[in-house]
Amino acid sequence: MELKKIIKNNHLEELFSKVTIGIEKEGQRILENGQISKTDHPKVLEPRHKNPYIQTDFAESQIELITTPERNEKDVIRVLNAIHEVALKNMPEDEYIWPLSIPAVLPEDKDIKVAQFEKEWDIVYREYLVEKYGKYKQMVSGIHYNFQIDDDFMQNVADITNTDVVDVKNNIYMKLARQFLRYQWLLVYLYGASPFAEDKYFTNGKKPEGFVRSLRTSKYGYVNDDDIVVSYSSLEKYISDLTGYVKDKKLIAEKEFYSSVRFRGAETVADLPKKGIKYIEFRLFDLNPFAPFGILEKDVRFIHLFIKSLVWMEEENKETSESKGKEYSENIALSHPLEMPIYLEEGLELLDNMKNMVRELSLPESDILLIEEKENELIDPSLTIAAQIVKEYEKEGSILEFGVSLAKKYKEDALREYYSLSAYNNMELSTQAVIEDAIKNGIKVDVIDENDQFIRLESGGVVEYVKNGNMTSKDTYISPLIMENKVVTKKVLSEKGFRVPGGYEVSTLDDALLKFDYLINKPIVIKPKSTNFGLGITIFKHGTDNIEDFSKAVLLALKEDKDILIEEFIDGTEYRFFVIEGETKAVLLRVPANVVGDGKHTIAKLVEIKNENPLRGDAKKTPLKKIELGEIESLQLKEQGLNFDTILEEGQIAYLRENSNISTGGDSIDMTDEVDESYKELAVEISDAMMAKVCGVDLIIKDIKQAATNQNYGVIEANFNPMMMMHIYPHKGKSRRLSLDVLRMLFPDRKIN
């Protein structure tokens, strides 16, 4: 099958360009001295066998991070980034992930704890591996690169050639496997990154002299005995050889056969002729210590192009490609990192072939530049990863300090904005929290519409859709419509016997002014009828007789909505109650933007100091908002006889805003354990009246320690899609991880950590 001709003659270039990529990344958990951790896999990440993202490999200390299959390099790295962050956040504070393939410090054999699994076969299998190969070689970590050619492309080729699509898949993937084994030496040259190991690693006493490119991919890595030779000349021969070794008990199972190419798509290789090879797992790659997640996005792209070019080009000799490729790969793996590649001419031809393919497929010019970058590395060995590692070793005299330093840096970077998931920082924080907790608990996540904050969650065959962090199928359609309309909210609650403020609904300034005479010097609140974000609200706690101030407040509210409410102001303190599935999970006191004097600094300086809190930012990508020094703040200070240059006495409080919204710089203070239970029950009843599973209830309460009566509270409003991050990361008090409660609501049969 001349695939290149078929593609060009039938205009399949675009379909051929579509692939699916997945990454599996192993890594050892270490302590800050570089010693491998002896702790068990983090309990909050259990059960590992049910988590598709975070598992363990051979050793209990060897964490394995697995991405979902993605359509492009950017997305697969994004998912890997997210999983990496989740893993680091849930590891003990003094643990890190070693960034190189081979640990700098290998523990005593007896101290290496084999991964703990539930299935007896998994335990038996690992005990067998220990007995046959020893523990040290299996402590080596790497990257597995999963690659699938688009099914539509395969079907088109099948239709054009009048061939069964399963046969097309098997033929193309078998060719790809042979080609990869033949030319993988180039990838070993470029990405080899395990140039040395301590003496105890070499259990039989034999070791290479000096530095090499890749111990992991050489005979010193985790390889089968020399008498295990499996042919890739055809799928039938591959199956015959592999099943024969298992039958003769030279291998305990098919998966004991270790090759840089593994076929995926069936439980056993014997099923591949009928089911077809679905994708190939390339197990060749060392960890790149200079990449925070073990591999760079540009290298995921280069490997993609390299693999695709192997399908594009014709085969040399499929009978000898495997043996020749093995020889080439071994020679490169054991060559010195600063040595010129002995197959330079062939390497340059491969790269030229890649560039020609890029042009013929009309791929981006950036791909040409990337290939040329690798061309430079081919003719200058000092630019390769292995050479850079050796330079670091020679500079430090040890790889230990270098590796630990990087491990600490990568964890510090991942935890710097600990309240967010950096790979998804374009999404709102509540959605990020749900994604993070879903990954932690092994619930599959698919971002359907990033701009609209829409995600798909799946666990145990159950699919749920979530918008904006907590809008789900559990709520009725009418519920948010009731809460959006403050007049309807008040009427519904009033009918149910809840205390709500009296007032008027108006739609113009003239209408409002007609009510002014009745409202002079009465405590009132002026606010939009249908807003959910605290915008356009003015509070006159002591009333006003100034018609200009009254008019300004009315116009401010009318900016946010065509209809506004003028309500009585109920005396007391406002609290936000977060209700989910008939239970109040969090209670928050929101304090207006303020600073506390120290007798030394001006108000402006105190604001600057307070804004240094990492939780403060734009309140979109941070849980809290930085306090501003604008006209509104200036007027608020003026009412208190203060200005930005005032130096407050120690303990003196200055308020820069009247309203307590987080979006205007307010403080969030957790009060869940301080509030009398009667108010929590009241909030649940209000949520039920709104027919809401998730609801933010705002109550004015005179004294939270005294039980609720009809006279000591008032309902300000009920909110759909209530903000979660101010509860999860409050300015002061205990964190309430409400995103976990959302997952518990959606997946009641699954244990959520």
Predicted regions and their residues:
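ATP-binding N-terminal substructure of ATP-dependent carboxylate-amine bond-forming enzymes
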Residues: 417-484, 488-491
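C-terminal active-site "lid" helix and adjoining low-complexity regulatory extension at the edge
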Residues: 637, 661-674, 688-692, 701-753
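A short glycine-rich, hydrophobically flanked beta-strand micro-motif that places a catalytic Asp/Glu
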Residues: 97-102, 320-324, 564-568, 692-705
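Active-site nucleotide/adenylate-binding loops and adjacent lid/helix of ATP-dependent enzymes
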Residues: 464-628, 677-680
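Loop-rich catalytic cores of soluble enzymes, especially ATP-dependent carboxylate-amine ligases
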Residues: 5-10, 105-106, 116-135, 139, ...
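Sequence termini and other peripheral, non-core segments
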Residues: 1-54, 325-440, 469
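Terminal catalytic/cofactor-binding subdomain
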Residues: 1-130, 137-141
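A long amphipathic alpha-helix within ATP-dependent nucleotide-binding catalytic cores
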Residues: 249-261, 306, 310, 314, ...
